[in-house]
Amino acid sequence: MKAIAVEPGAGTPTLIDLPVPEPAPGEALVRTLRVGVDGTDDEVIAGAHGGVPDGDDRLVLGHEAVGVVEDANGTDLEEGQYVVPTVRRPPPGVETNVYFERGEPDMAPEGEYVERGIVGAHGFMAEYFTSPADCLVPISADLAPVGFLVEPISITEKAIEHAAATRSAFDWRPESVFVLGNGSLGLLTAAMFRTTMGYDRVYCLGRRDRPHPSIDILDELGVTYIDSRETPVPEVPEVYEPMDLVYEATGYAKHAFESIEALAPNGVAALLGVPNDWSFEVDGGRLHREMVLHNKAIVGSVNSNRDQFASAVDTLAGLPSWVIEDVVSGVYGLEEYERAFSDPTDDATADDDTTIKTAVEFSNI
């Protein structure tokens, strides 16, 4: 079978041949339909994040997948059933651990998990993959063409759930929401806040010039676009309004601290971006004081569990179809898989790029 893999330091993915995997007891064989590409894939390809499986010299990419059960292999799944795989698995040689037993692999610390297509385990960018049946979340046939969006939406499901949990000790009624980042994850999240969650006052930060497809989506949704070059995050409360909930999806390290200043009293910021090391000065005393005197909170969030995947399926079904169509910039077959990935040699900057979300198609739906 064909697969898309990367070798450490290579900087570009390649198409390779691998044998079709054999499902172990409790596993199903899945025929891959489509696999999404996101910023994590770019980081893995660049060697800035992740790692190959033990004893291997390359990593099969892909963690945002949708497929169809080819061989149920005695599990409760049915052949022909559409499924989306979760990402985390126990480390090699470990059948399970307390985090997986609790159904909370997303809360496992480093060393207690591997992530398919990211670190320590091959991903889903292959014509077939195997997976434990309990790591496969059913999805309807009508959602299968965009099922690769379930994983990123599940990331937001968890972040919102955990942010709300920090406010559960009192009667918290958020009205204003601020999404930092107008990439694919930020756009999907802004769409969730406006449509399936029903927020009226939603703002989204970016640094792109009009016209741009991402800003067009925000305008159509009724989300206020804020250009960070004109209004930096700390100035947002004065120019617009203080925010009850800030959702950070930029990976820009200063935003972790600036989010505190953007929050309204009793607000919470959820941080999802993963920045590189960066030293800079902050007024720690002022930020500490802001959090204490105004009951503010910050929560970090990574990965998601099966329940959040299931919620993401429902959310995806509730999003307007036009949003999905506009977010997905292109789906490319194996003969042109390179087009789905960012080109590190391209002179065009991210600000000029009109691509929002891409995917590789391995099999017709």
UniProtKB/Swiss-Prot annotation:
CDD domains: glucose_DH (cd08230). The keyword NADP applies. Its EC number is 1.1.1.47. One of its GO terms (molecular function) is NAD+ binding. Keywords: Carbohydrate metabolism, Metal-binding, NAD, NADP, Nucleotide-binding, Oxidoreductase, Zinc. GO terms for biological process: non-phosphorylated glucose catabolic process. Zn(2+) binds at D38, H63, E64, E151. Substrate binds at T40, E115, E151, N303. Its cofactor is Zn(2+). NADP(+) binds at N182, G183, S184, L185, R207, R208, L272, G273, V274, S301, V302, N303. Signal peptide: none annotated. It holds the Pfam family Glu_dehyd_C. It comes from the Archaea. It is an enzyme of class 1 (oxidoreductase). Coiled coil: none annotated. It catalyses: D-glucose + NAD(+) = D-glucono-1,5-lactone + NADH + H(+); D-glucose + NADP(+) = D-glucono-1,5-lactone + NADPH + H(+). Catalyzes the NAD(P)(+)-dependent oxidation of D-glucose to D-gluconate via gluconolactone. Can utilize both NAD(+) and NADP(+) as electron acceptor. Is involved in the degradation of glucose through a modified Entner-Doudoroff pathway. PANTHER family: GLUCOSE 1-DEHYDROGENASE (PTHR43189:SF2), ZINC-TYPE ALCOHOL DEHYDROGENASE-LIKE PROTEIN C1198.01-RELATED (PTHR43189). Belongs to the zinc-containing alcohol dehydrogenase family. Glucose 1-dehydrogenase subfamily. This is Glucose 1-dehydrogenase 1.
